[in-house]
Amino acid sequence: MKCAEEYMRLYAVTDRAWVGGQTLYQQVESALKGGVTCVQLREKELDEEAFLKEAFELHDLCKKYNVPFFINDNVDIAIRCHAEGIHVGQEDMAAAQVRQRVGDEMMIGVSVHSVEEALEAVRHGADCLGVGAAFSTHTKADVDVLPEGMMKAICNAVDIPVVAIGGIHKENLLRLKGTGVNGVALVSAIFGAEDIEAECRELKALAEQL
């Protein structure tokens, strides 16, 4: 499945750490109402069956809004819930192996941090790239921020959609203008917001200026 650039505009990545008074389902629905263009379920806490149940529920929700649904890292869950996409990091299964498992219909996203990693991901069948960290982030304390100019260099080197991730929020989002990214992937800026729907509307308006 070809990854459309517009899927990357406002890409929500879930994080159970931000689930407070609402359920994750309610949070994701608020984000969808606010205009997110892609949802990635990143789940490190649940056992396989609970993860699968959640994946089916959130995938059905995303279908109502005609928004593609990605699973982070777990290829088996992605296959079983018929997700539109699977996203893997540099430490996870290689994109070429993922492609063998999922076939041609599922989109594959790969996290990259350099031009070399980006070109290798494309060569191995990636449909889109997550590039970061764009800025310092509270979500992953040990993350390395990209060197100056690296985001633009990666975007210039590939011909598939690129989404920036890492430490992005309303105040710094437009600093990515001119880098060539197709959109932004956000965790705490969305799911840590008091009013997720309203926050997503503001973030999307900014992302559309990139």
Language-model region placement:
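Glycine-rich beta-strand-to-loop/alpha-helix junction loops that act as flexible
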Residues: 131, 163-168, 184-188
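A short acidic, helix-capping loop that chelates divalent metal ions and anchors anionic groups
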Residues: 41, 78, 135-141
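Conserved N-terminal beta1-alpha1 strand-loop-helix module at the mouth
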Residues: 1-93, 100-128, 146, 153, ...
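Glycine-rich, flexible loop/turn motifs
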Residues: 108, 131, 139-142, 186
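Asp-centered catalytic/switch region of ABC-type ATPase nucleotide-binding domains
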Residues: 181
